Amino acid sequence: MSLHLYNTLHRRVEPFEPLDPACPTMYVCGPTVYNYVHIGNARGPVVFGVLAALLRRRYGALRYARNITDVDDKINTAAQEQGVPISAITERFCAAYREDMKKLGVEPPDIEPEATAHMPQIIAMIEQLIERQHAYVAMEHVLFAVNSFADYGQLSRRDTEEMLAGARVEIAPYKRDPSDFVLWKPSSDQLPGWDSPWGRGRPGWHIECSAMAAAHLGETIDIHAGGIDLQFPHHENEIAQSRCAHGSSTFARVWMHNGMLNFEGAKMSKSLGNIETVHELVAKHPPEALRYALLSAHYRKPLDWSEALIAQSVRTLNRLYGTLRDLAAYPARAIIPGNIEAALDDDLNTPQALAELATLANEARIQLADTTHHAAAEVTTALTRLKAKLLGAGLALGLLQQTPEAWFSQGTNESDETHIQALIDARGAAKQARDFVRADAIRAQLAAEGIVLEDTPQGVRWMKQHT
């Protein structure tokens, strides 16, 4: 099966056919760096990171850009409230974002353009829009004339009245039409600004992505992706700007949108006070469990985020890593199974891929439990093959990329491990001396410290209990 993706523009699943099969292009909208990102903001990077890896396997190369918005009124407000320079806000939260994504197993994009480094390209694109009569200057602002673009609304499929009702549209006296949006606005001396033909100012949010995408990926790109909340007005405006500036019929050939996260059944929002940041979550839970949870529902569907979901993800990973630990005697290199690739080819069906991963682990456990009825060479071949597929399935999803020992000892340090091993040895000595009361007391002590013991034919194993 070839890769098929749901294209929001056409409202259907379509075969993916890149403009250049030697190197597809993909642009994903990144964060505005004024605070730590919440867990909903991580869904796109995780899911589209899986897609990026799939595209590299399929085509051998990929040009993947994910931007950083480092000029925005939210950033200005945060700096003012905290009494620090704007650069202190952007540098701090840009670094935090990269670190949080790394912990979630998100590979960095090939290109991570920052808006402030692309002012010449942004200004040049605005000049093109004015020259082509798709934009106008009014009271030191430059605005895009929505009525000049006949296809406006093709992505969100809204009429003008719906657009005005569904977005925070500023009704300003300098607008020719209420639906027109800002490309450039004036800056006071206290705000960041750049010299331009229209005076000192700064760009609107939408033009930044259009200019950066064109600068790094060209006037027409294969895939543009982001959260469903960006479909309108951000992505709709990107299409209008880009097509009008370049005089082209297509900006992005495939538009992909991931669904939003709900928290304990309610929409995640600052007003409800139920936002959970990635920064907080990776400090409390194994980051790989958060990644697993983000992949557990199809990317286009809403995902109900909860402590129960995280706990279930931890338990599942305990089983998967436990299987790999039991397969330690069988060296193997990762081989991505065909049914995993088929699941991902089906519009990134990660729930199906995770189900296939679980099936592989179950098959391995059955084989491990039934080694006496088969020749040793046959058992070795079968278990080595299953381990290779298990590792490969994990690789395709960005899971199982640490050793079982590292997974089970998360949250402990070398001193903790020495202490734990000493107690395990003491428990072993107590059992050998048939002092079972002492042995049980040691197990209880370790349990109170969050350490779970497992007695196996290979010896005592332990794991740090995670929530």
From Swiss-Prot:
EC id: 6.1.1.16
Catalytic activity: tRNA(Cys) + L-cysteine + ATP = L-cysteinyl-tRNA(Cys) + AMP + diphosphate
Binding site residues for Zn(2+): 29, 209, 234, 238
Signal sequence, renumbered to the chain: none
Cofactor section: Zn(2+)
Enzyme class, spelled out: ligase
Key words of the record: Aminoacyl-tRNA synthetase, ATP-binding, Cytoplasm, Ligase, Metal-binding, Nucleotide-binding, Protein biosynthesis, Zinc
GO CC field: cytosol
Pfam families linked: DALR_2, tRNA-synt_1e
GO MF assignments: ATP binding; cysteine-tRNA ligase activity; zinc ion binding
Subcellular compartments: Cytoplasm
Binding, ATP: 270
CDD domains noted in UniProt: CysRS_core
Cofactor notes: Binds 1 zinc ion per subunit.
Example GO BP: cysteinyl-tRNA aminoacylation
Domain of life: Bacteria
Span of the annotated motif 'KMSKS' region: 267-271
Short motif 'HIGH' region, span: 31-41
Subunit record text: Monomer.
Similarity comment: family membership: Belongs to the class-I aminoacyl-tRNA synthetase family.
Database matches in HAMAP family: Cys_tRNA_synth (MF_00041)
UniProt protein name: Cysteine--tRNA ligase
